């Protein structure tokens, strides 16, 4: 029962979208930008020498557009169609989008940071030594081949030596081994008392991406392939009768899956907050040794524990006790081989990729070793790398400009709240107080993680992984009983993403996302508002989506809505959900409106806020037409450009089934068709496919 960091936060892009990267945009001289637009852009952009926007002549890569498509029929294809028709997803990727492009830039930069650290001949124990040696050990494939399974043999022997169910639990609690957990336990901010940390407990333990992969006929072929995969993992470890043992492990996991809550159910913050005393835990789920487990974790003195999925935990405990120890040992062995595969011999590494990459996501080729090494270092020492990343690659002026943009968006949203017709004064007062209490974090943390306790060597990548796991475990559990670390970040500066934390009531924008197509100081003002402005609005909007609205300005899970206003909100949310339920990204896979509701509300609210802020910023000004596009057109085009992307079919199926975000096409078309200004900007009429009658258009925030 390893720790799992429970983040009460909502990210801009899902994990699947985080293959992100840099764009090779066209640059142009400052004399090419229209004078009136230049004067506007300077208000939010750097006053350093202009070199022109990275993309196109004003921030949009117009060569990617497909003018033959009517914007009212498919706005996403109108803005991105030529790119969608001609771009080929790299063989090493399951998808490719704006995030991927920036991720690749970040990846190259981090590689340079790592190489410089390795070449520095730094003293033992220094950050540079640890960064360089972690990467060097990962890259030494000759040594990895020669070592075989020897580096993990002691761990495998420990699994094989287990004799009782309690022995299995002890292994699951031990961060020095890669034992998979059937129940996740970790420390996070208490959702109802956000001034303290509490222990959270929830369902865990599946080897496939989601419970549906075990239970739905749509994924029956994946279930068969997974059993074959489990058999190979056990064979690598020398387990006899591996095929039969794999079937037993699969049956155990399927039983867990049947007990698990769906992803949509786990979004409900009221239903996932359930306090239990230690005695109540033992009564509810007696199949697990709660008292000794909490003592091992140093959490036995807690007044209560928060269980996110009570029925799943209760059933998991029964399944665990009813499962033979031999099956549980094999479950742990298969999980360990999979966990360490990147630093085990090529035969094992290739087999794991064949299943997790090719079978599950349709990816033809494994990523180059150096890229995987960069990811490994980022995972182990992300903030150490991030500190250097910020020093080298993040202009301080970008932070100032973002501060100004956030200020503009907040002020604009406050105006919208003041004039929101469907909300009563009592709820409005609370909403404005919450907005006023928002904390923005931009670029990088004020304080950096101290990695002095992390031990790293240049010749043992397996041990490096162990030490990184132990370090993360200790970092998490050391927070229990301590004051809230308000300066903590949950993403590194080199991460291309953003998030909102409900328990902290904060919006966070790492440095790496503050690049084109999201943000470009040299781009047209409308483009920046339609891109990063909408991203800012999206994150603010999460504080007021179907789940974020349940927290107040302090971050506490508290119902501050009148019944009437809550009902009006739900009516609007349901109407939006009904629209998204009709969208079918891939045949047979429709968007789940319950799973994606928060993100869909964030997208619609974010773009609406950004448009309002853009009109405030340009009020009374003569906004020019650029390359034939009005300011409003450029604003909406920027939103569409941000979300352009392609998926392999298997990856798209997984995205639709497991991701709380709608895919790019519907993040664009599903939003703009609800906004009156888009209809006016592109002269959309009843004859167009995206047209919605005015009374069917949803406006929440």
What are these regions (language model features)?
Residues 31-51:
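Post-signal peptide N-terminal segment of mature Sec-exported envelope proteins
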Residues 51-56, 69-143:
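Active-site-surrounding "flap" and adjacent substrate/cofactor-binding loops of secreted or lumenal enzymes
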Residues 117-408:
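Noncatalytic, helix-rich "gating/capping" subdomain that lines the substrate-entry/channel surface
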Residues 19-22:
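C-terminal motif of bacterial Sec signal peptides marking the signal peptidase cleavage site
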Residues 24-27:
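Bacterial signal peptide processing site
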Residues 46-63:
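Short, Gly/Pro- and small/polar-rich lid/capping loops
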Residues 284-287, 306, 310, 334, ...:
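Intrinsically disordered, low-complexity linker/terminal regions across diverse proteins
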Residues 1-11:
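Bacterial N-terminal signal peptides that target proteins for export
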